[in-house]
Regions:
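Structured functional modules or segments
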Residues: 1-69
């Protein structure tokens, strides 16, 4: 369990938005768990179709966070 953040700092620009093209390994968002920030990377190059979480939302292990096609 952790907390999802869509930008690198409070009030900052989001890592990505729906419609953005991303490269494999590019950071989509971060999840804070036990005070450690974990970057969540795009599994492949493509287009961000949706972000399935909101900024500051609690998330669970194996929960879908974004759609990249």
């Amino acid at each position: 369990m952790g907390t999802a953040y869509l930008s690198p700092e409070p009030g900052g620009k989001s890592f990505v938005a729906p419609g953005d093209k991303v490269a494999a390994g590019q950071t989509l968002l971060i999840v804070e768990a036990m005070k450690v920030m974990n970057a969540i990377a795009a599994p492949r190059a493509g287009t961000v179709k949706a972000l399935l979480v909101e900024n500051g939302q609690p998330v669970e292990y194996d929960q879908p966070l974004a759609v990249v096609e």
